[in-house]
Design a protein with these regions (language model features):
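Compositionally biased, intrinsically disordered low-complexity segments enriched
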Residues: 18-20, 24, 40, 160
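Beta-strand-dominated extracellular/periplasmic modules and repeats
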Residues: 40-195
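N-terminal secretory signal peptides
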Residues: 1-21, 28-36
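Helix N-cap and loop-to-helix transition residues
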Residues: 20-22, 26, 135, 192
Length: 195
């Protein structure tokens, strides 16, 4: 039986110290265009999006959920934050044991990937890729940095969910406060048009 995946509620960004503000920033999956007041029993499936060219060539099984350091040797540049979310099916039932992978650019707009030929500098302390397994309640969390825009794209974080060798969903998460950049991003706008 095939299950449709919903990320509910949409993942949130929580600024980490020293930027610990009262306000929680919302990092939305493609659910951005959907009404936030939907009941858990009436969830809408998170739309799939492209994997993109910078998924790791060899995903690091030991990467863990902290993208802000590589082997504990210093901290990544950029504004530290946490991505916190929960994966359910469209009835609201938690999906435990899923592998959640994320990857994104560093604070300069460059991916940690050999095919990214951007002139932007690399950050030796930013991993660029992380992985976590959903708990019994479908929850996951990541420590990373605020994503930044680069030419042609709004700030975003790529996300892939799988169980074993079976890919269940590839999507992207967006910042609701990046309204001008979001409006210029074709992939983001295609989600709004489809909703």
């Amino acid at each position: 039986m095939r299950r449709t995946i919903a990320v509910s509620p949409a993942p949130t960004l929580e600024p980490q110290p020293p930027w610990n503000r009262q306000r929680r920033l919302l990092l939305l999956s493609p659910l951005l265009a959907l009404p936030a007041a939907r009941a858990a029993s009436n969830l809408v499936a998170t739309p799939a999006q492209m994997l993109g060219p910078f998924y790791p060539l060899r995903p690091d099984a030991a990467a863990g959920n902290d993208l802000t350091t590589v082997d504990g040797k210093g901290r990544a540049q950029g504004r530290a934050l946490r991505i916190v979310g929960r994966v359910t099916d469209t009835t609201g039932r938690a999906l435990p044991g899923l592998l959640v992978e994320i990857w994104q650019t560093n604070a300069h707009g460059r991916y940690h990937h050999p095919h990214d030929d951007s002139a932007a500098p690399l950050d030796p302390n930013f991993r660029g890729y992380g992985r976590a397994t959903t708990g019994m309640d479908g929850a996951y969390r990541f420590a990373t940095i605020m994503p930044v825009a680069y030419p042609g794209r709004t700030p975003h974080v790529h996300c892939r969910l799988s169980r074993g060798e079976r890919e269940l969903l590839v999507t992207q998460m967006y910042l609701p406060d990046a309204t001008a950049a979001n409006a210029r991003d074709g992939l983001f706008m295609s989600l709004r048009e489809a909703a």
